[in-house]
UniProtKB/Swiss-Prot annotation:
Family stated for the protein in its record: Belongs to the class-II aminoacyl-tRNA synthetase family.
EC nos: 6.1.1.14
NCBIfam families named among the record's database cross-references: glyS_dimeric, PRK04173.1
Stated name of the protein: Glycine--tRNA ligase
Coiled-coil residue windows: none
Species assigned in the record: Methanococcus vannielii (strain ATCC 35089 / DSM 1224 / JCM 13029 / OCM 148 / SB)
Molecular function as annotated in GO: ATP binding; glycine-tRNA ligase activity; protein dimerization activity
Classification via PROSITE patterns: AA_TRNA_LIGASE_II (PS50862)
PANTHER family named in the record: GLYCINE--TRNA LIGASE, GLYCYL-TRNA SYNTHETASE/DNA POLYMERASE SUBUNIT GAMMA-2
Enzyme class: ligase
Functional description taken from the UniProt entry: Catalyzes the attachment of glycine to tRNA(Gly).
Length: 574
């Protein structure tokens, strides 16, 4: 067995991870968390909440996992949320084209076009791994699970592919909650769904998974000089910039640069201080949950792999023994893409009024409608046209003026309908106005965390094999069971003292496990395998002097302390 197989074996035996629907043969892309896995995952999430809700001052929302078609049409997911697919001509099995290629030849397929993938398959004579048959042409496959709302399937919908859209949809409410004072942030933690083509990477590639996403709304002019950046500018990180990835003369090691975030921003490797700051927050979080620092790097997306909404994006990648570097966190500058997309498609104003330091005189466009003609032409929709024209930006207004001057029709698209605007419908003039502020559409910095991948990496990075034992060397904050409590033997009242001590731990909010089965060495081994940092043994000495033995997991050091002080001692260590 390789390391991955050993870890999966341990996690199944000890109640961390189980195959879903196992008694029915299981389905690829689904895993259950057992009792200890569920606690571990919750500990990872609670640490994440500490960083974003307590430390950063974000607030959490909770929105539906079913999203109407129009929401994901507006967000771009209907058109863009796809993977390359190949289907076998013989057995009709489907596979991810890029994954099939990477499994057969040493090549990075990230960002390759469908034609390039097709060429690689043909040139290298890649066949179906199941039956050896030839593949059909590479095509695209939308990864969203389709569903419908209500009887009859009349209202099309999808299971959400990300939690972020729920935050963007509620932006007006969130902004009101923060009294419309930028910057501010909202987070959401919950299930997301991706109908993966052929998930063959165990817990790494799931069809149903947990995301923790933070959306930080900021005036785009404040991204370059971000106040909080000063506190992290000297943090040195391993970075894999886009230009280095494309430089074939560099070795894998040479492509990684270790530099401070301050230098990375100064040298235009990272786009700006705001995104660099949240790269630092990500690093701190990953260290807090026990990720091995030597197995962490930050990789910049290449232009041809950038998401449809992103201006810059960095992945926190974690190294795994079987699958190599895997993306676990994406920190993206989503610009104003999402808010503008939902403004356009919903007709709602998702801008924020930003006050100037002092009022100033500016030139603005004013529109006077020919109400008689507009009312006659558009009837009940005339009001929609008027409001939509008033919302036009200066750039759009100049485009309108230029079009009408050429005696052409200007097509104004709104969420309700499209309007053909003619020159005779309106008069546009420039006027000077004294204003105290302006409306802007905020930009969004989004750190998006794949909780399941991160949780697996916490397990793998904690997994250790020594001559006589296997252990999970979790950091104390995420260990599912904090303390094992043992009576050396079940007589002379030792078991009763140990049982009472276990209950005392639990009353103090510490998960403790009582174990009186087998030799004491076997009990230590069981606790080591589930990552319990401390064991407390009640023995003959306890009956004499009211002390107990504490054994530390990593060092295996043993020492005695008074029984009545053991709970406080463990609490302090945790």
């Amino acid at each position: 067995m390789d390391k991955y197989d050993k870890i999966i074996d341990l996690t199944k035996r000890r109640g961390f991870l189980w195959n879903s629907f196992e008694i029915y043969g299981g389905i690829a892309g689904f895993f259950d968390y057992g009792p200890l896995g569920a606690i571990l995952k919750s500990s990872v999430i609670n640490t994440w909440r500490k960083h974003y809700i307590i430390n950063e001052g974000f607030y959490e929302i909770d929105s539906p996992t079913v999203n109407p078609y129009e929401v994901l049409k507006a967000s771009g997911h209907v058109e863009n949320f796809t993977d390359p697919l190949v289907e076998c001509k013989s057995c009709l099995e489907s596979f991810r084209a890029d994954h099939i290629i990477e499994e057969n030849i040493e090549v990075d397929t990230e960002g390759k076009t469908l034609n390039e993938l097709q060429e690689m398959i043909e040139k290298n004579n890649i066949k179906c791994p199941k039956c050896g048959g030839e593949f059909k042409e590479v095509n695209t496959f939308n990864l969203m699970f389709a569903t419908s709302i209500g009887p009859g399937g009349k209202r099309a919908a999808f299971m959400r592919p990300e939690t972020a859209q729920g935050i963007f949809i509620q932006f007006k409410r969130i902004s009101q909650f923060f009294r419309n004072k930028l910057p501010y942030g909202a987070v959401q933690i919950g299930k997301a769904y991706r109908n993966e083509i052929s998930p063959r990477q165990g817990v790494i590639r799931l069809r149903e998974f947990t995301q923790a996403e933070a959306e930080f709304f900021i005036d785009s002019r404040k991204k370059e000089n971000f106040e909080k950046f000063e506190s992290v500018k000297d943090l040195i990180l391993p970075l894999l910039p886009g230009k280095n990835q494309e430089n074939e003369s560099l070795s894998s090691e040479e492509k990684i640069v270790r530099m401070s975030l301050g230098d990375a921003v100064k040298n235009k490797i990272i786009a700006h201080e705001a995104i660099a700051y949240y790269i630092a927050v990500t690093k701190k979080f990953l260290m807090d949950i026990g990720i091995d620092e030597t197995k962490l790097r930050f990789r910049q997306h290449l232009p041809n792999e950038m998401a449809h909404y992103a201006a810059d994006c960095w992945d926190a990648e974690l190294y795994t023994d079987r699958y190599g570097w895997i993306e676990c966190v994406g920190i993206a500058d989503r610009t104003d893409y999402d808010l503008r997309a939902h403004m356009k498609n919903s007709g709602e104003d998702l801008s924020v009024f930003v006050e100037f330091d002092e009022s100033k005189e500016i030139e603005v466009y004013e529109i006077e409608l020919n109400y008689k003609l507009v009312g006659k032409t558009f009837k009940g929709d005339a009001k929609i046209l008027e409001e939509s024209l008033k919302e036009l930006s200066n750039d759009k207004m100049e485009e309108l003026i230029k079009t009408l001057k050429n005696n052409e029709k200007y097509i104004l698209k709104t969420c309700k309908r499209d309007f053909e605007v003619l020159n005779e419908y309106l008069t546009v003039k420039k006027v000077k106005k004294n204003v105290t502020g302006e409306k802007i559409v905020p930009h969004v910095i989004e750190p998006s965390y794949g909780i399941d991948r991160i949780t697996y990496c916490v397990i793998e990075h904690a997994f250790k094999e020594e001559d006589d034992r296997t252990l999970l060397a979790f950091v104390n904050t995420v260990s599912p069971v904090k303390v094992g409590v043992f009576p050396l033997v079940n007589k002379e009242g030792m078991d009763e003292i140990a049982e009472n001590l276990k209950n005392k731990f639990r009353k103090n909010g510490i998960i403790a496990e009582y174990d009186d089965s087998g030799a004491i060495g076997r009990r230590y081994m069981r606790m080591d395998e589930i990552g319990t940092p401390f064991c407390v043994t009640v023995d003959g000495e306890t009956l004499k002097d009211n002390t107990v033995t504490i054994r530390e997991r990593d060092s295996r050091e043993q020492f005695r302390i008074p029984l009545d002080g053991v709970v406080d001692y463990i609490k302090e260590k945790l």
